[in-house]
Amino acid sequence: PNHKVSDFLVPYTSSGCSAMCLYCYLVCNYNKCSYLRLFVNREQMLDKLMKTANRSPGDLTFEIGSNSDLLLENSISGNLEWTIENFAGSKKGFITFPTKFDMVEALLPLNHGGRTIMRMSVNPQPIIQRLEFGTSSLTGRIRALQQMHAAGYKVGILIAPVVLLDNWQELYSQLIEQLADELPDKLKKELFIEIIFMTYSYIHRAINAEAFPNAVKLYDKSLMTGRGRGKYCYRSDIRLQAEEYLKELLEQKLNGIPVIYIV
């Protein structure tokens, strides 16, 4: 169970990702690089989802993209297209996935039945360039979000992960200004926002030091504290300041768009 955007996180047609985001937990699962692994029992998995959805007294939402970026996977397998069209036949429920990619063209003409929710993960372009190697640009992501909304999909924005680099206030101010300027009013009225702060770990540090020795260093002991086994998160006072700053920016620039959670 999840109870943020979705009711359940479910493993689906792939795990891993060929992008190289420096903070991603998938890298730790593979102990150096997060290669893409495909699963071939998609019919069994979707059948279980649809049976669970249709047995429920109300609509359930299933997060199918927590172990991979399904839009990237779709460029190889076509699994996301197949899933969207088949789940459209369900009498109840929704599927949802986040993405950092803009290759949505194959999804636009599909019969989705209003049962698929795409959440576009965004960050300031300098952070994308420095931390999210191999992913789409911010401009491309915003364009893809607009295209999916125009095709009738439910859409959301995931500001994630929030990374507190030296000039983070300026970077996130520019991000939210760009969203305010480029998103059409109709889309804004139907949008929701999620905010997730970065969690890091000593395993990330070791992997990144070897694989990307010249990359930006994400661990900052002046800002971070231990959390669980070998994990780091921003100190509560630092985190609270950043939350308030982001909420104020969103209120000023994107007033009325609900922020459904901050973690």
What annotation goes with each model-predicted range?
Residues 73, 116, 133, 137, ...:
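Residues lining hydrophobic/aromatic ligand-binding pockets adjacent to catalytic sites
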Residues 180-263:
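Auxiliary Fe-S-binding modules of radical SAM enzymes
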Residues 68-71, 102-105, 116-135, 161-166, ...:
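Conserved radical SAM core fold
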Residues 12-21:
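Cysteine-centered iron-sulfur cluster-binding motifs in ferredoxin-type domains/subunits
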Residues 42-48, 77-83, 135-144, 171-181, ...:
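Well-ordered, non-membrane alpha-helical segments in soluble/globular domains
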Residues 1-7, 22-119, 147:
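Conserved Radical SAM active-site core
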Residues 59-63, 94-96, 115-119, 154-158, ...:
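Structural preference for beta-strand elements that scaffold enzyme active sites
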Residues 141-204, 254:
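Conserved C-terminal portion of the radical SAM core fold
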